[in-house]
Amino acid sequence: MTIKATDIEILHRYAEGVMERSNHHAKNVGAAALTLLGGVLWKALPGSIEIRTYNGSLANMVWWQSERTLKNYAISYNHNSCEIEMRDESVKGAVLFSISNETTPEKILSQLSEL
């Protein structure tokens, strides 16, 4: 199930959960996740961001539509590579790019600017 991220309270809860999880078992993606979240807010068609829910909590999967291209994208954490992946269309789509804290904000901006 998903929830529309239509207000700052939902986005705040999502960011809080991402940072909590990154402090426990994904220490190498917290800063990159915050950069990516800001970039998605910049690029997304207003009202298009959806966040997966799991047992009533917000989970690590996000779907959004680009305001510029109207294409759909999915973001999820890959537990094997310990990176966040941006995928084409869905969480099963082609990986467009992967990021971690080693990815510079400039690189994330460059990758997002093409979407």
Residue ranges and their predicted role:
Residues 1-54, 109-115:
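N-terminal non-globular leader segments, chiefly Sec-dependent signal peptides
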